[in-house]
Amino acid sequence: ANLISLSNRSLLNINEMITVESYKLELNDLYRLYQFVLLNKRTTILEFGSGFSSLIFSQALKENKNKYKNDVKKLRRNNPFELFIVENEKRFLNITKRRIAKFRSKQDTKKNKNKKSEVKINFLFSECVMTNYRGNYATEYKKLPSCNPDFIYLDGPDQFKIKNKINNFTTSHKDMMP
């Protein structure tokens, strides 16, 4: 870039933040999550927040189901090979639902149409609010699924989508950005 174009560029003010509508796809992170679920033989996943990781988890659980479904029958597991997704933004929950449905329909046309090998995915919308936990400010989802996961993935909520304030404190303030 030349000097003139650099000088015409508007800079952010000190307290200004760049907000992004969608997040960058991190293939290395997704692969690491996929491998973790496979290598550790996870059967029930609780995911806070949704996205491409939801699709990756569903595929890893499907692979584990195909390999270990007979072994898991011997365990005390009420939700084997289920993915529970808790999301506080309906928009992202719907995007994830469509993405998984589209992927599954493409898989069905390519391979067999055996629905028994698919894992059950439970989508739950829940508001997220500020709360006081043992004298500390925290955020909590108002609704949680009834499950006993062997893997919990925390990828939400967006700190700017938290409802309520405690003593006028909220994580939604830009200065609270980690």
Tell where the protein language model's regions lie, with residue ranges:
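Conserved class I S-adenosyl-L-methionine
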Residues: R42-G51
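Class I SAM-dependent methyltransferase Rossmann-like catalytic core
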Residues: S7-N40
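Residues at the starts of beta-strands that form the adenosine-phosphate
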Residues: T44, P80-E82
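S-adenosyl-L-methionine
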Residues: N94-C147
